[in-house]
């Protein structure tokens, strides 16, 4: 929690490794399934280097494309945007931390910048990094992205 400061509410993906991080804030954790990682379907567990080039091309060129049994980036954005909107309603009243995964955080980034999901292919997000989205008088403002300074030597 020291990399972020005091928080009023902690929201987390239901996956165990993320919940463990969320619990480190010492606050009750609200589990919200909308913050779970993108469903990679038939590609789940496949090393990035083993994914065929044609698959990458299809994925990058069509935000509606999804691996068999999985979820598209468009679907992910449709899932994450309402969660962002709900959290923005408590801005100014509560400081909220969301502990999630790379893809949903990138979807939240797209929401905050008012751009489409194509941004997911144009930014890198490190595991354990901190991204800060503040809600100002005119809506969401990206205040920090992919900060890993708190990880020190562990990075």
Give the role of each language-model region.
Residues 55-75:
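Short glycine/proline- and acidic residue-enriched helix-loop micro-motifs
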Residues 12-13, 78, 99-100:
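Short beta-strand scaffold positions
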Residues 91-108:
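A glycine-rich beta-strand to alpha-helix segment
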Residues 24, 107-111:
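Active-site signature of alpha/beta-hydrolase-fold catalytic machinery across serine-
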Residues 15-19, 102-103, 127:
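Alpha-helix N-cap/helix-start capping motif
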Residues 31, 38-50, 89-94, 111-155:
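Acidic, low-complexity terminal tails and accessory targeting/binding regions
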Residues 15, 73, 77-81:
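Amphipathic, non-transmembrane alpha-helical scaffold segments
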Residues 1-57:
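Phosphate-coordination/substrate-recognition cap region in phosphate-metabolizing enzymes
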